[in-house]
A protein has these predicted regions:
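Membrane-proximal, glycine/serine-rich, low-complexity loop/turn segments characteristic
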Residues: 25, 35-37, 68, 89-96, ...
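Structural motif
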Residues: 29-41
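Glycine-centered loop-to-beta-strand initiation motif
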Residues: 30, 45, 63-71, 75-79, ...
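A short, solvent-exposed loop/turn motif at the edges and junctions
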Residues: 50-56, 78-94
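Short, acidic Ser/Thr/Gly-rich low-complexity loop/linker segments typical of extracellular
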Residues: 52-68
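Outer-membrane beta-barrel translocator domains and adjoining extracellular loop/strand segments
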Residues: 95, 216-218, 278-284, 306, ...
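Face-selective signature of the C-terminal outer-membrane beta-barrel domain
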Residues: 333-349, 378-411, 424-579, 597, ...
């Protein structure tokens, strides 16, 4: 009996060992051939864990005479193979595990032999296919504090205040750290602005980036990724600093970065009352809004209340500015096929400002000087949860839900000089709640991709306002009260509800391996309700309901120097507004873009499209809305929420690494048909505005960036030019009118990059803004000059920065000059 048990034990042990061995054995195999089907012998096949080919390799092999190869990696998960051979272009494909074959087709490259010889001065840039590699050490001088500071010194790269990165005028879609997608989309900007510069070893811009998902090969446009190479990140890293100053000034910040095999997170605590921004408009949009709020034609609809606007667009006249923020973003890779991420953000802001301005009254052709103080307090709390599941290699399911709350209070006290002699206090409170969710499914079917998307959004905003004044200027029934001389008041309570539900289904495929075709049908239903309660004006309710049904088709070629992207959306638009006739119409929104690549670093693109924008609910309402102590909005004549127009854009990039000259030119012209036109009835200093259709409105914007690095001495020169022209129609007391705004900005910066303890930079900027109202002799002309310089000194662990700045601005009525001197001493502590 014991012998039988022993035999059984041995058999079970062998089976277990065999099963474990079989489970652990993963084989990647296939053949490498050229376009004619001939075997490529002697090619090197490298195996990596991601599409960026981030070291270390998982394995490699040399192809045999018949072009075959076989690799047995030590670990599993997603894998990519790269084939390299002299005389052929490098080829990269996603690996398939046996019994499936990972075959690779390589293309002859006649230029490969000539590219072996490198001549000229070292530029710190290497262009290989769709990847631009930067030697960040070549461009930095050691005084950079964050990743953002380093990126801003790279040719062609720009970073916005919120941390959004652009390359050649195009937004970067994905942030990678050492080839890994570690962070949530909401936290990318925070990482860029807060990750220490000391950890950066290099940077790469990857054009035509693909993440290996089923839908990555069928997008309507190419995606761009930024890969930050580090010197090595610990599982938990970060920093904290705090400072204080005169008149109870404080500035504190902490940044925590956690990276692991499955879990990565970022946490930021930041606050100050010195005016340093910690929460920008871009941060607000990325956390409070989402891509789910999209109409059937692909347009994004974003609405921001007046109280939100006053909090997010921070003016220059703040005499008190406290801002605190706490964020937590985490991404967890539950398995090779399931990824979960979430984010949480809280922001508190408290500001106080003083303003003196000239108010224009066209009916009397006069200016009245107004002085005011404003207190603004606000809180935001948002949370998001998302999941990305790939049940098979051919399917991907994405889902996310986002919830947000806002609480904003605004108080203004003002007095007017001159003939008006008016003073008033205005208190406004805004409470907002919103929930948004979307789900998408991508499935590889046949020779293409089947995709289905759905979205849901709900918003509830409550605005309460109380205006007290010493004069009754508006044609409404004021209430009476004793409030320090302000004996009259107007109170209003607005509630806005929004519900949006949409869906889209379509199919994408690649034809002849060079043309991508995308066809879909979509629908979007939206309902906006505005309720008004007031003691002084008639209350009521307005409902605006829209339905869009679209058929969309787009095509683009993916190979060749000349690329064409063309398509159109045919949309049936139905809208109804309370008390007005419903409208049905059919519109076509075509788009065409052409781009030509003279080389990997030299390109020109043109795009032309018909556009659509949504009109704000308040500008379509039949209700009487009080906007200010002397302004009100009356019944609107707008009967459709859709405003159409035309957009024309040009983008030119020339990155000459040999001469180290980098030029980017971008221009855009937008024309709105039958523009939304304010019809102003003005009597003295009182205005009533109603909106109607008018002539077209134009907005022309042009920008040019030139960067030049001198080879004789380590100096870099950056020149930025920006021009803007805006023309919009209006009607004043029955007379057609046109308002124009002309803006010009120019800035030049010269910075040194010596390999020594001393460096510096000088800058000079000029700006001018001219606004002109055709029906009036009143014209505003504001010009300014800003000059500055910085001296950097570094020795060992000690860094010293001295700065000087001068700012000059003048108009027809005032002029100011500001001088600024700053000193900063930093001692870096190094633990052995």
């Amino acid at each position: 009996m014991s012998f039988i048990r022993l035999r059984l034990f041995i058999v079970l042990a062998i089976c277990c060992i065999w099963s474990v061995s079989a489970h652990a054995q993963t084989i990647i195999s296939g053949h490498v051939k050229d376009l004619q089907g001939e075997a490529v012998a002697g090619a090197t096949v490298l195996l990596y864990s991601d599409s960026l080919l981030t070291p270390p390799m998982k394995g490699y092999a040399i192809t045999r005479k018949d072009g075959s190869y076989s690799i047995s990696p030590k670990s599993g998960g997603d894998m990519w193979v790269q084939a390299k051979c002299l005389g052929y272009k490098d080829r990269k494909v996603k690996a398939r595990v046996m019994p499936e074959s990972t075959d690779i087709v390589m293309e002859h490259d006649e230029r490969s032999l000539s590219e072996i010889v490198v001549k000229g001065t070292y530029t710190g840039i290497k262009i290989a296919g769709d990847t631009v590699k930067f030697d960040t050490g070549h461009f930095s001088n050691g005084f950079e504090n964050s990743v953002s500071d380093i990126l801003e010194k790279l040719p062609g790269v720009s970073v916005s205040e919120g941390g959004n990165v652009s390359y050649g005028g195009k937004t970067v879609d994905k942030l990678l750290i050492d080839g890994r997608d570690l962070f949530t989309r909401e936290s990318d900007g925070l990482v860029i602005k807060n990750m220490p510069a000391d950890v950066v070893a290099g940077a790469e811009i990857i054009k035509n980036y693909k993440d290996g998902t089923p839908g990555s090969n069928y997008g309507r446009r190419d995606n761009t990724a930024l890969n930050i190479k580090t010197k090595g990140l610990g599982r938990l890293s970060g920093y904290a600093d705090a400072s204080g100053g005169y008149k109870d000034k404080y500035n504190a910040k902490s940044f925590t970065l956690g990276t692991g095999n499955r879990l990565s997170l970022t946490a930021i605590l930041s606050g100050n009352n010195t005016g340093t921004p910690v929460f920008s408009l871009n941060d607000y949009l990325s956390h409070m809004m989402s891509g789910s709020n999209v109409t059937a034609s692909g347009q994004t609809s974003i609405k921001i209340s007046g109280a939100e606007t006053s909090l997010l667009y921070r003016p220059d006249n703040l005499c008190k500015d406290m801002n605190n923020i706490a964020t937590l973003n985490a991404k967890y890779k539950a398995s090779d096929r399931l990824e979960i991420n979430g984010s949480l953000l809280f922001n508190h802001s408290d500001t106080h400002s003083r303003t003196e301005r000239d108010e224009t009254y066209l009916s009397a052709d006069t200016l009245v000087r107004s002085a005011s103080t404003t207190d603004n307090r606000g809180n935001f709390l948002t949370a998001k949860l998302a999941a990305d599941w790939r049940p098979t290699d051919k399917a991907q399911l994405r889902w996310n839900i986002k919830a947000g709350m806002s609480d904003i209070s605004l108080g203004t006290a003002a007095t007017n000089s001159g003939t008006s002699g008016t003073k008033y206090d205005n208190t406004a409170k805004n409470n907002g709640r919103d929930i948004e969710s979307n789900v998408s499914l991508n499935v590889s079917a046949g020779k293409g991709l089947l995709f289905v998307n759905g979205n849901f959004a709900w918003n509830d905003d409550k605005d309460r306002s109380m205006l007290t004044t010493n004069r009754r200027l508006l044609p409404v029934d004021y209430g009476t009260a004793d409030n320090g001389g302000n004996d009259f008041y107007i109170s209003q309570h607005r509630t806005t509800h929004r519900l949006s539900i949409g869906s889209e289904a379509g199919y994408s495929l690649n034809l002849m391996k060079c043309v991508s075709l995308n066809a879909s049908v979509s629908q979007q239903h939206e309902q906006n309700t505005l309720r008004l309660t007031s003691e002084q004006t008639a209350g009521g309710e307005d409902k605006i309901q829209t339905d869009e049904y679209s058929a969309n088709i787009f095509a683009r070629n993916t190979k060749g120097a000349l690329k064409v992207n063309a398509g159109a959306s045919v949309t049936v638009e139905r809208s109804s507004i309370t008390g007005r006739q419903s409208e049905n119409r059919v519109k076509v929104y075509p788009s065409l873009s052409l781009s030509y690549d003279f080389s990997n670093a030299h390109s020109l693109s043109l795009s032309l499209s018909r556009t659509k924008n949504r009109t704000e609910t308040a500008k379509m309402s039949a209700l009487t809305l009080i906007d200010s102590y002397n302004e009100m909005t009356a019944t609107s004549a707008i009967d459709t929420p859709f405003q159409t127009g035309t957009s024309l854009s040009l983008n030119y990039n020339n990155y000459n690494t040999a001469s180290q000259t980098y030029l980017t030119v971008y221009a855009n012209m937008q024309r709105q048909d039958h523009a939304l036109t304010p019809v102003v009835s003005q009597e003295g200093t009182t205005s009533t505005v109603a909106y109607a259709y008018g002539s077209h409105a134009d907005n022309i914007y042009a920008m040019a960036n030139l960067e030049k690095r001198l080879s004789a001495i380590p100096l870099s020169i950056k020149i930025n030019l920006m021009a803007n022209y805006v023309e919009s129609p209006s009607v004043l007391n029955g007379m057609d009118n046109t308002s124009t705004l002309k803006s010009l900005k120019a800035k030049a910066v010269v910075a040194s990059n010596f390999r020594s303890m001393f460096n510096g930079e000088v800058s000079l900027a000029y700006s001018r803004h001219i606004s002109d109202i055709a029906s009036s002799s009143i014209k505003t002309d504001i010009s300014g000059i800003d000059a500055g310089g910085k001296l950097y000194v570094k020795t060992g662990r000690l860094k010293f920065t001295a700065s000087m700045a001068y700012s000059h601005s003048k108009t027809d009525t005032y002029r100011y000059d500001i001088y600024d001197v700053g000193l900063c001493l930093t001692l870096k502590k190094v633990d052995s």
